[in-house]
Amino acid sequence: MNKIKIAFLVFSLILLCTGCIEDKAVVEKNTAVFEESTINADSVSDYDIAAANNAFAFDMYSQLARRETGDHENVFFSPHSISASMAICYEGAEDTTKEQISNVFYFPSNKTVLKVRMERINDKINSVNSDYELQTANALWVQEGYPVKETYIHNVQKYYDGEVTNLDFAGKPDASRDTINEWVEARTNDKIKDLVPEDAITADARLIITNAVYFNGKWMYEFDKEMTGKKSFYPTKEEDISVDMMYTCNRFNYGETSKAKIIELPYRGNDLSMYVVLPKSNNIEKFETEFTLNDYTELKNDMEVVEEVKTTIPKFKFETKTELSNSLIEMGVVDAFGQADFSGISDSPLEISRVIHQAFIDVKEEGTEAAAATMEEMAMGVSISWDAKPKEFTADHPFMFFIEDGRTNCILFMGKVEYPEYEE
């Protein structure tokens, strides 16, 4: 029997199948009434979804940072988006397929624990705040006539707030592609375009799961546009390029070790921040292979509120579109791409065929837009440094950055700037 192919596009997950199609959309009825798995409430609270998300973020970064050429490569992705999409897929996974996804994404074996925590964290992320825009959205697109289990549909709608829509992939692939891409564009302020490529929806397509994350925020302390000017940036010790560098001097959470400096640049509303990690040595390739989640956490925890930090970082704007299938296989999600068991979704066999992730970021004087506030005190600092000498944070060589939600402690976006460019 042929297996249904799952093309996983993050922000979109596509499940492809070769099973037969009936004239009307079919929802497989379960004889049992919907019953949530019986779990101890403590098991939900004990599962640290932020720790799982952040551990996966560093694992995926290690894959994306691998150099296939000698060219400078910026990195940007949303670990939360990838995890959220795979969580919806995980909801229907069984046996070794489920186990492997769990191991790579640090998901709990109890699916109810995961979906309850996902529901709670998405509620926090999507809570309205007039100081910034942050939203995440899920959708399940089903081939007309393809049988999907009622329990699965119920869980996607209830716990992941997923929209469920029937489309005719087989008869109208182009129209279906346009509909899905328009959905993604609408939820990312038109920043993510053409996520689903022309060759993605074939005659075998049966299910598409999409997740979109969008953030647009202004700095708590904006950079002065009049201070922005062309300055040197050094992609390597031997290279020197001229880029637009922004400058500000203000009170920030700041820290450093013998290997790196870190600064927290908060956004208005004080819920989200960008953390910039600058290696002291201009050797990003060596630094990123040694820099772990524990190192990052310790660096953040050791920050102090410094009254005056002279901060210089480049403006940058770029978009990435990456095939993640091989990376996930190397990380351990093997069976899902071949001998898969997604029987929790449908009795028709399914497997993942491809994974594509697309993300966009724009960092400028006013703030950050990623598709992927004025306050007197900082949320992060434990102590205050009264050193009369100002600290300097000059990001004139490659650095890593993280956009975190302080309410959930989740890394929503993660990346590396190795060659900053900015086009209006």
Swiss-Prot record:
GO terms for cellular component: extracellular space. CDD domains: serpin_like. SUPFAM superfamilies: Serpins. InterPro entries: Serpin_CS, Serpin_dom, Serpin_fam, Serpin_sf, Serpin_sf_1, Serpin_sf_2. The record marks 381-382 as: Reactive bond. Keywords: Protease inhibitor, Serine protease inhibitor. GO terms for molecular function: serine-type endopeptidase inhibitor activity. Belongs to the serpin family. This is Uncharacterized serpin-like protein MA_3388. It comes from Methanosarcina acetivorans (strain ATCC 35395 / DSM 2834 / JCM 12185 / C2A). The lineage of its organism: Archaea, Methanobacteriati, Methanobacteriota, Stenosarchaea group, Methanomicrobia.
